[in-house]
């Protein structure tokens, strides 16, 4: 919640579902929060602050381990954090929050996978979702 001025017209929240834990477990970690949790946060802040909340960034891109960049990470490794099935689940998760505006982080990644890695799986999921 903003403390000073100016205050925004609406607030946003970032949702990263599957990330690399480089500090404790050194493995991929899936945040356990159900979609309704974010909808609940949005509802509470709307009640108290009267502002709409959007998903300003929903993870829809692979999260490479150990600070690697996407190009230096194998496709097999990238699929451990985001494959076509997980992307489909991510779209459904975003919708299940109940928020009307969801901005996805990863469109350029889907394009990269299709054009550079010759893997259209994510691009195809996105095409189906945006019909």
For each feature predicted by the language model, list its residue ranges.
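Glycoside hydrolase catalytic-domain groove-lining segments
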Residues: 1-68, 121-126
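Substrate-binding cleft of secreted/luminal carbohydrate-active enzymes
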Residues: 51-131
